[in-house]
Amino acid sequence: MRSIGPSSFGLRLAAQAIAAGEVIAYPTEAVYGLGCDPLDARAVRRILAIKRRPEHKGLILIGADLDALWPFILPLEPARMAEIEASWPGPNTWLLPARPDTPTWLTGAHATIAVRIPGHPLARALCAAWSAYGGGALVSTSANLAARPPARTALEVRHRLPKGPDLILNARCAGNPRPSLIRDARTGRVLRP
């Protein structure tokens, strides 16, 4: 498990690691996340194995901007999309209808996919570095074993997930006390406060 700082060089190394099929850990608004290329089935399944998370639950995708998320989602009516976009960047995850060709290793047993544009500047910069490297969206799931408390520091990632990520982007989380709010984009209903 390698650890790198949050410099522009570190972001390029993280993007290279993602392109090579590696799993990375990085800070978000509240907790550390595990990430990889969402189109790399092997890397996604490795994250699920690290977390001991069943595939049917689905995963969250983050992007530097909405353009990174469009390949995975179907739009809703303009007023609803404007509400969603106004909540970003920030700790607001929305369940949007998934495109029919979105892989089931991302959607799980759902017709929707969870997406957001993170408010943590480093998480957003990581997404931008990945996009510049030819990627787009990035898997984002809390760095923890299923049903266990998530890691909030790089050291906690190492201790809680010893068979965890290949690379840790070592920086502070933004200090939010809770992970992102999850809402159904069609109804606005809060699914996780």
Set out the residue ranges of the language-model regions.
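Active-site-adjacent structural elements in enzyme catalytic cores
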Residues: 1-193
